Amino acid sequence: SSDLGDGFSLTEEILPAIAGHDLLVLCNPNNPTGTVAPKKLMTKILEECNKQSCLLLVDECFMDFTDRRGTLTDCFRSTLLVPQTPNLIILKAFTKTFAMPGLRLGYCMTYNRELLHKMVLCGPCWNVSVPAMACGQAALQDKGFLRRTRSYLKVERQRLIDGITRLGGGVYGSKANYIFFRYPDKTLHQKLCD
């Protein structure tokens, strides 16, 4: 089959493994497959982390390249979760979303004030450069950028998936700006050059 489906996707099998741990780190979308964990599953993981007093750190740096439905960022913005989510930390990055890798501009979101205080104490006194700040502010001015980028990526991702499939490869269900695929033999390089 050309569609390798869930492959390495996150499942409920992770829930019992949370017990006894202080921190769970997840990438959503998954790296390297680009698959997005369903909101229902992420909510269950968050609830289990709450029960187990385990911090949940979710790297959503590539989420802006997906259709973004049901992300923990969306949940975080919901005032209903505020008192229940002191153990949730979400990482985001301008450097990925706005193609500014050399400028190192990212941020975290959490309601855990104690953790934020510790991060400020441990961080450098000058953690964002002036050029990075200026680029971040400029990036936020283009309100249609993310919509246009998602639309472009949706078409180009499918074109790439179709091409790999035509060459005999199998692709995992990526929703991100990258794909993960399996190819049956070692001739892919030559076929891509042809």
Residue ranges and their predicted role:
Residues K40, K44-E47, L80, E114, ...:
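Alpha-helical scaffolding segments of alpha/beta enzyme cores, especially the outer helices
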Residues T165-G170, Y178-D194:
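Conserved C-terminal alpha-helix-loop-beta "cap" of PLP-dependent enzymes
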Residues L23-C27, L57, Y107-M109:
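Structural motif
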Residues P29-P32, D142:
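A short, flexible beta-alpha/helix-coil linker loop
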